[in-house]
Amino acid sequence: MHDSVPSQEKLLAIIVTYNPTHSFVGHLEQLCKEFGKIILVDNGTSQDKQATLNNQAQFFGEQKVHLIKNNKNVGIATALNQGFQWAIEHGYEYVITLDQDSTPAAGMVDTLIYALEHHPNREKLAVLAPMIVEELLPRLLQYMRRKNMFLYEHASAETGLLRNLTITITSGSLYNLGIWKNLGPFRDDFFIDYVDTEYNLRAIQQGYEISVQCEARLIHNLGKRQEKKLLGKTLYPTFHSPVR
């Protein structure tokens, strides 16, 4: 399973939802054009918005959209584990995870698949992420790479493949399900924060690799970020919504 290349028949998208806005209806319609199959894992959305999710799933049909419903917010880790397990049980080998408000740029999925196919360490590639472009403050996300036992360094590029990274975010990332099964699920007790970080570090510890393909782009908001000046430096602090 580890060294195969995903096709639309072996790849699906997993989106964790929680009280999505009305714009999610059109968003899901666009995503259905990018993916052959989408799993929605809903984390206790309110009843009025739950009806919209049900209608959307019924509109596209089970062959296109499968809805997993939790009666409360069980957290991002548990929801992802539910989606990953469903994918494995139904014969899928790879998943791409998305936040409900993240938008793949044109060609992101195909670019990730191509990058995986040509990756020099494909059999050990646990996570292949896109380059994140922040919507509110249009800039590329900087990633971290371990320089030595004690130091880390920024790994920045606009093109090409960034290898041996330490931390990526879940949204937009392509996961190898065989490796996920070997490593074990996301930590349910982490709920939301550091779910992706813990998984990546665990993968690295077990000899797997994390990479970013810069030409694959995902439009994403890392919380509510604002540009701030401090001691002559430009900072971008993140202010998360209390309903996360």
Which residues are covered by each model-predicted region?
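Short, flexible, basic/aromatic active-site loop/helix in glycosyltransferases
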Residues: 145-166
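Active-site-adjacent helix/loop segment of glycosyltransferases
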Residues: 201, 209-244
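Short beta-strand-to-loop acidic/aromatic patch adjacent to the donor-nucleotide binding site
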Residues: 92-103
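Conserved donor NDP-sugar-binding/catalytic core segment of glycosyltransferases
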Residues: 107-142
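A short, conserved alpha-helix in the catalytic core of glycosyltransferases
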Residues: 173, 179, 183-184, 189-216
